[in-house]
Curated annotation (Swiss-Prot):
Record's protein name: 4-diphosphocytidyl-2-C-methyl-D-erythritol kinase
Residues the record marks as active site: 11, 141
The reaction(s) this protein catalyses: 4-CDP-2-C-methyl-D-erythritol + ATP = 4-CDP-2-C-methyl-D-erythritol 2-phosphate + ADP + H(+)
Organism the protein comes from: Nostoc punctiforme (strain ATCC 29133 / PCC 73102)
Pathways involved: Isoprenoid biosynthesis; isopentenyl diphosphate biosynthesis via DXP pathway; isopentenyl diphosphate from 1-deoxy-D-xylulose 5-phosphate: step 3/6
Signal sequence range: none
Root EC class: transferase
BP GO annotations: isopentenyl diphosphate biosynthetic process, methylerythritol 4-phosphate pathway; terpenoid biosynthetic process
Binding site for ATP: 99-109
InterPro entries with a match to the protein in the record: GHMP_kinase_C_dom, GHMP_kinase_C_sf, GHMP_kinase_N_dom, IspE, Ribosomal_Su5_D2-typ_SF, Ribsml_uS5_D2-typ_fold_subgr
Keywords from the named record: ATP-binding, Isoprene biosynthesis, Kinase, Nucleotide-binding, Transferase
MF annotations from Gene Ontology: 4-(cytidine 5'-diphospho)-2-C-methyl-D-erythritol kinase activity; ATP binding
Keyword ATP-binding assigned: yes
Entry EC number(s): 2.7.1.148
Length: 317
């Protein structure tokens, strides 16, 4: 039976602006998304039965239909029934390294890897844009996870405009294992507290979303100016998450107070906080300093870096 191993990178938000409400009930967003080296490994294998099986090494990750990787396989079965009938079922094994419920798109990147893996298993020959379009029906982050690199994301996050890739900006990530922030809660609370400032007119919504293309952080990315990028980090959701989660706020403050940190911010709806560095040595030094400043076994810390790719095939059998 054929099989593929794929690398599924996490992502962080370098910029997240909530512009207003969309007619479909989602928020209109303007974001800059960045792939990072912290990754899961996904193995996708053909099996002789007409079923979908998911295995995962992490006890908190479900292996049933509530798992986005499972739903990605279901989507491919529905979309390509003839290929399913010809090649049989799929077994998916997730080796989880990305923290769960962390605002790092762990579920979305696993789903993206399954789409890419099944495309290869079933010899469908789908283009990247076709894979992204399929991914968009599963979740807002899935299209970016297919493509990876650095990109502006607008709409609900599924409309992508690639930017020149940022390579080798070093990052320290911090996340409390037992702490989760509900993404729906974060957006709902933001709407309750700051909805008065939302843009309502549809044309103005689109114009404001497109304004990010000429914004200061995009200019810094185009010039590959790491220090300026770090100074222009922005996340509207910090306005509701940080006051409600003192641990996240404290972690962010500890990062901000360390020498060598160019900038720090919460990623997505949290609770992961990240800091940017010019060198791996500085990142590793600050990781140790943060570990000494916050003595808590529940706190996970990782050193990683920006990367230029999304889903990547590492081997096939």
């Amino acid at each position: 039976m054929r099989s593929y191993s794929l690398i599924a990178p996490a992502k962080i938000n370098l910029y997240l602006e909530i512009i207003g409400d969309r007619p479909d009930g989602y928020h209109e967003l303007a974001m800059i998304l960045q792939s990072i080296g912290l990754s899961d490994q996904i193995d996708v294998r053909s099996i002789s039965t007409d079923s979908i099986r998911v295995h995962c090494n992490h006890p908190q990750v479900p292996t049933d239909k509530s798992n986005l990787a499972y739903r990605a396989a279901e989507l491919m079965v529905r979309q390509f029934p003839e290929a399913f009938a010809k090649y049989g079922g799929v077994e998916i094994t997730v080796n989880k390294q990305i923290p769960v419920a962390a605002g790092l798109a762990g579920g979305s990147t696993n789903a993206a890897a399954v789409l890419v893996g099944i495309d290869l298993l079933w010899k469908l020959g789908l283009t990247q844009s076709e894979l992204e379009e399929l991914g968009g029906t599963l979740g807002s982050d899935v299209p970016f996870c297919v493509a990876g690199g650095t990109a502006i994301a607008t709409g609900r996050g599924e409309q992508l405009s690639p930017l020149p890739s940022l390579d080798n900006i070093y990052i320290v990530l911090g996340k409390y294992r037992s702490l989760e922030v509900s993404t729906p809660w974060a957006y709902k609370t933001y709407r309750q507290q700051f909805g008065h400032s939302y843009i309502i007119d549809t044309d103005n919504l689109a114009a404001r979303a497109s304004a990010v293309h000429s914004g200061a952080i995009v200019k810094a990315i185009l010039h590959k100016d790491t220090r300026e990028i770090a100074q222009k980090l922005h996340n509207d959701l910090e306005r509701v998450v940080l006051p409600a989660y003192p641990q996240v706020l404290h972690l962010r403050e500890v990062f901000a107070n360390q020498e060598g940190v160019l900038g720090t911010m919460m990623s997505g709806s949290g609770p992961t906080v990240f800091a940017l560095f010019e060198s791996q040595q500085q990142a590793e030094l600050v990781l140790q300093q943060v570990r000494e400043a916050i003595i808590d076994e529940d706190l996970e810390l990782f050193v990683t870096r920006t990367i230029t790719h999304g889903i990547k095939v590492t081997s096939s059998v």
